[in-house]
Every structure is written in structure tokens, then in C-alpha cells.
Amino acid sequence: MVNPTAVIRTNRKSLSLTISKKGELIVRAPRKLSMEYIYSFIKQKEKWILNKQKVIQNTNLDNNELFNSNQYLFCGERYTKIEIDKLKDIEISGSNIFVPANIDEDRRNLLLIKWYSNITKEIIMARLSYFADLMQVNYSSVKIDNSKSKWGSCSINAELKFNLRLSMLPHKVIDYIVIHELSHLLEFNHSKEFYRIIESVMPDYKKHRARLKEYNFALQLLR
């Protein structure tokens, strides 16, 4: 049973549940509503509450906590960091990411940026090839950048940029970003027509767009 962190009594007529940025369950209830009813309502919403708390737990991880906790993000999953002596570059196998041992933080950061950049480019080029052909669009160039605010962009000259951290995201979320930027080659705005184009390629794009927000914290990972 999930217990609320706080029950706030107000003059409202309905009962509401809110999950704070810290993952706390806050209940707002009418003044005369019984605690028995409140706990019954919480029980009915328990699955929703736990899912929300899990999402917040993930998004609250900052750079130091994630990259110093023996875990790295790759394709939406957490991989265990294993340090290996005499290893020169980063390697991935199974559910592990192997990194060189006995190197300082700055050197490891540079290796991670290089590794994520390379693997992101591989993923992006493959998905661009598929979706550009499907959508019958052409782009002039592709660049992998280190933006701390954008996952991708498309210029008026059909130049595409994608964030090196894209390979941290789930595959379907990556696809959404690729489709989003390619759609700008047909509609250079965020109009209804623009989103109609996206929907024609990815009918459930709203689900993946919403999930992307859960990974906004990843934009701040790596320096």
C-alpha cells in the first residue's frame, strides 16, 4: 500500500493525487472526506502512482549520480559499468559497458563523448536512410553535436543536427526525433500539418514524444 506524504484538506469538492518532483504522493481532499475513502482511492490508483514515481526516480538522476553510480544509459536501458585494465576505448557487451580503468574523470568524459557520438551516428544514419526513403525527402548534411538544450534540429538549408546523447534513448523515441526533423523538410514549422505528417509515419508519436520528456535529464549528462 502506498502511503501519502501529505494529505491537504481544502474546500474543494473532489479528491486529487499529485506526485511531487521528489516522488512524494500529495493528496488534496475535501475537508470532510474520510481517511478510509482516501486510502481506498489510493489503492485503486496504486499502479499509476508507482509508475509515476518510477519515472521521477529516473529523471531525478543527475550527471554525477548516474555516471558515478556504475551505470550508463544506452537505448533506454541502464548498463553496468565495468572497469578493465589496459582497455583503451569503451566497449559494450551484453548488459555491460566496459571502460578503461585508472583514468581521470576528464579523460573518461572525453571517451564517453566520443563513444556516444560514434554510436549515435551509426544509429541515426541507419534510421535516416530508412525514414527519408519512406517519406521521400532529401537532406543536405548530418552532424552529431553536443547541445545541452536540443535533441535535434533542421535548418532551412536541410542541414540536420542530432544530439550525441540520442543513443541513450529508447529506439522508438530516437525514431520519433528522426521523423520530427525530417518532417521539417516538408513543413518548416510546428503547424497542424507538420504534426499530421509525423502522424502519417508514426501514428502513436504522441506516446513517444511524451516519453522523450522523461529523458530530458539526459541532456545534462556528460560535460
What does each model-found stretch correspond to?
Residues 181:
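Walker B catalytic acidic pair
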Residues 1-175, 185-223:
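Active-site-proximal or metal-binding-adjacent scaffold patches in catalytic folds
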Residues 178:
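Walker B beta-strand of ABC/ABC-like P-loop ATPase nucleotide-binding domains
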